[in-house]
A protein has these predicted regions:
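Intrinsically disordered, low-complexity terminal tails/loops enriched in metal-binding residues
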Residues: 2-7, 19-194
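Structured mid-domain segments that build the active-site/substrate or prosthetic-cofactor binding neighborhood
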Residues: 9-11
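Hydrophobic h-region of N-terminal signal peptides that target proteins for export
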Residues: 13-19
Length: 194
């Protein structure tokens, strides 16, 4: 009789454990299913895939850097360039479409070098020299990648020692990052990229 009671006790414990595991597995399955549904609703309802979101962050950080150069704030420009570098590192090349990937591979090293160079100095003149090169490569990238809104490709004929220089802006209004308040409105929109 004692053996029977012990066997029954062990059997009850095993059944309890089995039921507990089933409940845990069911709850985990429900949670995982909910997470999958959430990911699908985030990725597809917006119409933007993860790679596009990462590139949008890159462009947004470029625009923030440009705004600090407009303000002639070398300290803040260096900080924004660090953000740009960090966002460049987060782009997953294998998630880019073929055309974007081709351009990304062509410009990525130079874009990263320019961003790191701007981040490494607080000298506004040095930052602006690097921004000329950075803007050329970012233009190549924005031409093939989608951004959330229109991008304005702007040009100042006096920048870059009179050779002229371009930059990208989210605003149609010209705010010159190469001269800041000295010649804030110097330049024009030469292309609208949608």
């Amino acid at each position: 009789m004692k053996k029977f009671k012990n066997t029954m006790a062990v059997l009850l414990v095993l059944i309890s454990i089995s039921n507990a595991n089933a409940i845990v597995n069911y709850n985990q399955s429900k949670e995982l299913n909910l997470q999958v549904q959430l990911v699908h609703s985030l990725d597809y309802s917006s119409g933007i895939d993860l790679a596009d979101k990462n590139l949008n962050t890159v462009f947004t950080n470029y625009f923030l850097l440009k705004d600090e150069l407009v303000k002639t704030d070398g300290v803040s420009a260096a900080a924004k360039a660090k953000l740009l570098s960090a966002s460049l590192n987060k782009v997953k090349m294998n998630e880019l479409n073929k055309d974007v990937h081709r351009v990304w591979m062509k410009v990525m090293k130079n874009v990263m070098a320019d961003a790191k160079g701007i981040a490494a100095t607080e000298d506004i003149k040095s930052q602006r020299v690097l921004f000329v090169s950075l803007s050329k490569k970012m233009y190549d990238l924005v031409k093939v990648a989608k951004y959330d809104s229109a991008v304005y490709y702007q040009f100042c004929p006096m920048a870059n020692d009179g050779k002229g220089a371009h930059w990208l802006s989210k605003e149609n209004a010209v705010l010159n990052p190469y001269y800041g308040s000295k010649m804030l409105k110097c330049g024009e929109v030469v292309e609208t990229i949608k």
